[in-house]
């Protein structure tokens, strides 16, 4: 990734985070933009969103984000319009890395419990 694309990705991430904080409904889930990857020609910004909360609420928030894609792009464009000739189109993806890490930790914990011998009680007479 070139320095220009990294700077653009950081700018989009920072500004979209502020937009999400103001625009997304407060529904008991924590929504965070964990990363933005932008194509070399700056035409597409892939935005990775982490949603902490129940699966149902996460799906609902992600559906809302997808539905309001054009609205978020318009708000973002109004904030950073002087820095681009053409605003990149936004693609939102749910980042489930936190869930995957929790699942792997659970598997490791179960494997450790299964492999460790259970202590036998001492017979005291």
Swiss-Prot record:
GO cellular component terms, semicolon-separated: cytosol
Key words, A-Z: Cytoplasm, Ribosome biogenesis
Listed HAMAP family: RbfA
Subunit composition and interactions: Monomer. Binds 30S ribosomal subunits, but not 50S ribosomal subunits or 70S ribosomes.
Function: One of several proteins that assist in the late maturation steps of the functional core of the 30S ribosomal subunit. Associates with free 30S ribosomal subunits (but not with 30S subunits that are part of 70S ribosomes or polysomes). Required for efficient processing of 16S rRNA. May interact with the 5'-terminal helix region of 16S rRNA.
Family listed: Belongs to the RbfA family.
Protein name as annotated: Ribosome-binding factor A
Lineage of origin: Bacteria, Pseudomonadati, Chlorobiota, Chlorobiia, Chlorobiales
Designated gene of the protein: rbfA
């Amino acid at each position: 990734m070139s320095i220009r694309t990294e700077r653009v990705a950081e700018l989009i991430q920072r500004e979209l985070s502020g937009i999400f904080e103001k625009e997304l409904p407060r529904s008991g889930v924590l929504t965070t933009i964990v990363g933005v990857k932008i194509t070399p020609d700056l035409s597409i910004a892939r935005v990775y969103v982490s949603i902490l909360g129940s699966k149902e609420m996460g799906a609902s928030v992600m559906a809302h984000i997808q539905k309001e894609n054009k609205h978020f792009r318009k708000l973002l464009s109004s904030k950073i319009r002087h820095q681009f000739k053409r605003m990149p189109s936004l693609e939102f993806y749910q980042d489930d890395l936190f869930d995957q890490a929790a699942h792997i930790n659970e598997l490791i914990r179960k494997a450790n419990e299964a492999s460790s011998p259970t202590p036998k009680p001492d017979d005291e007479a």
